[in-house]
């Protein structure tokens, strides 16, 4: 089984990460192609295409301009935000972290796909951002889908567990994916209707990654006992391709 999650806008390069054996992102040639485009933009252009403040545009312009000399950090320790904070990465054993290295893929607008211990540099680039004529979803789709097929071919249980947002999971081409895709949904009953509440769903996704790591889970079936923030598996609303957890 391979799980996918979205990268985060929030980064933490200040906090020291534990000493681990780091790996190199697999799509650096394509990353450098995107960097060339990003480096050509002015601060004002970055502000517009990324819909960010002038201050953030300045920060990212400086990052892109001197990208090779920026500090590096393992992806799973560099990203912050609700998903990553609820993995509680600092509490994972080396054994759990090594398991994630071969069972988790972080989808990124700049790097495409990242193993947890792949080194990244500080950046901002959401998957929905349009760079000139480049649609990032289309840009990465074949590369990431082919890579996932190669990884799952080596796995005992050949499932792709989707814990990413729609924006990021759209890089998976269902017509070229050779193995079963299992989507995970975290729902809440609001006014008689089941809805996804973004912040709670993100926390639950992170907690599920933590459970996968700590228990060395390699099958969606083993996640049906997952409970966090009051979520519980709903047989009624689930299917072979959809795992639905409803908050009580």
Curated annotation (Swiss-Prot):
GO annotation, biological process: response to hydroperoxide
Highest taxon, organism lineage: Bacteria
Name of the protein this chain belongs to: UPF0246 protein RAF_ORF0648
Annotated disulfide bonds: none
Family, similarity comment: Belongs to the UPF0246 family.
Naturally occurring in which organism (per UniProt): Rickettsia africae (strain ESF-5)
GO CC annotation: cytosol
């Amino acid at each position: 089984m391979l799980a996918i999650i979205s990268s985060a806008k929030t980064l933490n390069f200040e906090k020291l990460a534990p000493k681990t054996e780091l790996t190199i992102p697999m799509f650096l040639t394509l990353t450098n192609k995107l960097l060339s485009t990003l480096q050509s933009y002015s601060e004002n252009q970055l502000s517009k295409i990324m819909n960010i403040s002038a201050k953030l545009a300045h920060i990212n312009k400086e990052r892109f301009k001197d990208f090779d000399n920026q500090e590096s950090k393992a992806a799973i320790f560099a990203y912050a935000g609700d998903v990553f904070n609820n993995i509680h990465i600092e509490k994972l054993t080396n054994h759990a972290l090594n398991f994630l290295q071969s069972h988790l893929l972080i989808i990124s607008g700049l790097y495409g796909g990242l193993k947890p211990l792949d080194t990244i540099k500080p950046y901002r680039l959401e998957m929905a951002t349009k760079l000139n004529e480049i649609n990032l979803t289309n840009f990465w789709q074949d590369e990431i889908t082919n890579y996932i097929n190669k990884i799952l071919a080596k796995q005992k249980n050949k499932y792709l567990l989707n814990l990413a947002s729609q924006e990021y999971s759209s890089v998976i081409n269902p017509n070229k994916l050779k193995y079963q895709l299992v989507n995970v949904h975290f729902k809440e009953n609001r006014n008689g209707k089941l809805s996804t509440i973004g912040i709670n769903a993100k926390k639950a996704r992170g907690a599920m990654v933590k459970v996968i790591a700590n228990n060395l889970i390699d099958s969606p079936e083993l996640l049906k006992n997952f409970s966090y923030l009051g979520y519980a598996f709903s047989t009624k609303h689930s299917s072979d391709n959809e795992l639905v957890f409803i908050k009580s």
